[in-house]
């Protein structure tokens, strides 16, 4: 396989820019180390529970948003209906 010669844009400079943003620090509740008393299975169970809690919270938030959106649509519909009745009287 032949490699093509590098042009000036592809030559690495001394000030390199990372391709990905720096990783945020791992939250303490998601950290696992073999030296801890917690077994790997217990860690996975705990992480699964946390993910379930987050999924339920997102689902609940989505349902509340949907109910609020339905109420807004119903109120606007009623308001426009009342305005139409008032204008056509």
Curated annotation (Swiss-Prot):
The chain crosses the membrane at residues 67-87. Residues 1-21 are annotated as: Disordered. Disulfide bonds: none annotated. Residues 1-10 have a biased composition (Basic and acidic residues). One of its GO terms (biological process) is intracellular transport of virus. Phosphorylated on serines within the acidic cluster, possibly by host CK2. Phosphorylation determines whether endocytosed viral US9 traffics to the trans-Golgi network or recycles to the cell membrane. Residues 29-38 are annotated as: Acidic. InterPro entries: Herpes_US9. One of its GO terms (cellular component) is host cell. This is Envelope protein US9.
